[in-house]
Regions:
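N-terminal leader/targeting and accessory segments in enzymes
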Residues: 1-97
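Phosphate-binding loop of NTP-binding sites
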Residues: 94-173
């Protein structure tokens, strides 16, 4: 397992989660995609327009997920899940709460990049330029929407000196 990213008790408290099962003390990452999940990650079963992360719990377990964050509403349909769970009212809202906790615990200088063109290029240029002055955390790929920004924040290491987030704007609010 990689370096600890989150203490599970702190995670559960931040997300207002109910623990179920034998939870690990820490997790090393946050994932919403079983194809990129690494052993020791917490898997967030986000429900989207075309998919439901709850359908991928078995794949997440096989990939090495340390725990699953699942919706209370989906719990009856899950049957007997062998992995530890953090049960929440809404998985995306819980991830947003964890993102708020990540921001609150960080002393990093935060840079938000937005606009209609060039966000990813600007974010990457800043990441490379700031790296000489300390540890930089930057959102992966173009994670700039209503789930990508909180996901990127939840992955913010405590010791990052800088954090760069790409923020898209596709509608008011």
């Amino acid at each position: 397992m990689n370096e600890a990213l989150w203490d599970v008790d702190a995670m559960a408290a931040a997300m207002h989660a109910r623990p179920l099962g034998d939870l690990p003390a820490t997790i090393s990452g946050i994932s919403i995609d079983t194809r990129t999940l690494e052993a020791g990650d917490a898997f967030f079963a986000i429900q989207g327009d075309r998919f439901d992360g709850h359908d991928f719990l078995t794949a997440a377990t096989k990939a090495g997920a340390a725990l699953h964050v699942v919706s209370e509403q989906k719990l009856p349909a899950l049957g007997r899940v062998q992995s530890p769970l953090l049960i929440v009212d809404d998985v995306l809202k819980a991830m947003s709460r964890l993102a708020e906790a990540a921001r609150a615990r960080s002393k990093a200088t935060i840079v938000a990049v937005t606009g209609s063109v060039g966000k990813t290029t600007t974010k990457e240029a800043l990441r490379h330029g700031l790296a000489a002055d300390g540890k930089v955390h930057a959102s992966a790929a173009s994670f700039n929407n209503h789930w990508g920004v909180p996901l990127s924040l939840t992955r913010l290491p405590r010791d990052a000196r800088f954090a760069i987030f790409e923020i898209g704007m596709n509608h008011p609010g």
